[in-house]
Regions:
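Feature primarily recognizes SF3-like P-loop helicase cores of small DNA viruses
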Residues: 2-204
Length: 204
């Protein structure tokens, strides 16, 4: 949270937040008002999805697309806008992804933060300290990074650790393949199992 709190502070009004449940299937309410708050933002952050939450793929695709979004603030007229933001979810519980289609997974990047700051390393309200002492340098770093991304046509090669994290997340999300590899003998071409029994074992 220190990392993203520092960035959001230097971005000012270009930063926006969104409730994490808007990005999951845990709520069924209309999301138009939530999406309306994204207009003009450059960075949108959602924090801490709950264990067991499932990603709402259709909402994610809308938010991470170049297609116009139709939104409406409460008691206001609806309007269209083109997304200009990068969406970030920082959480200890990666939400479940029910689909394995490329349309969803090409939008997902997993960046693991493995280091834990304890004892003297753990500085209270460190984001505020960073912004106060080095806010202009953080903003400069962001601008330089954006320029590099633009220069490379927005195709930036991810580090190996990020690629491994994405692949691991995708494998864990593909529950059918996981079930087949762990519970079924695929080498035995003569093996049979009643479909009802197979489905019950998969569900359990």
């Amino acid at each position: 949270s220190t990392f993203f709190n520092s960035i959001s502070s230097v971005l000012g009004d270009y930063y926006g937040s969104i409730a994490s449940d808007v990005l999951t299937t845990s709520i069924k309410r209309d999301k138009q008002a939530d999406l309306a708050e994204l207009r003009g933002r450059r960075l949108v952050i959602a924090a801490e999805t709950k264990a067991g939450d499932r990603l709402d793929e259709s909402t994610i695709k809308r938010m991470c697309s170049t297609d116009k979004i139709n939104a409406c603030k409460k008691y206001k007229d609806p309007f269209d806008f083109t997304p200009s933001h990068t969406l970030v979810i920082y959480t200890n519980n990666l939400p479940k992804v029910a689909t394995v289609d490329d349309g969803t997974w090409r939008r997902i990047i997993v960046i693991p933060f493995k280091h834990k700051f304890v004892g003297k390393e753990d500085i209270k309200n460190y984001a505020e300290v960073l912004v106060e002492e080095a806010g202009e340098y953080i903003l400069y770093w962001l601008i330089e990074g954006a320029k590099k991304a633009i220069d490379h046509g927005f195709h930036v090669e991810p580090p190996e650790e990020v690629v491994e994290a994405i692949n691991g997340y995708k494998e864990q999300s593909d529950t059918v393949s996981l079930f087949l590899s762990e519970r079924c003998d695929l080498a035995d071409k003569t093996a049979k199992c009643p479909s009802g029994e197979l489905y019950t074992k998969y569900r359990n």
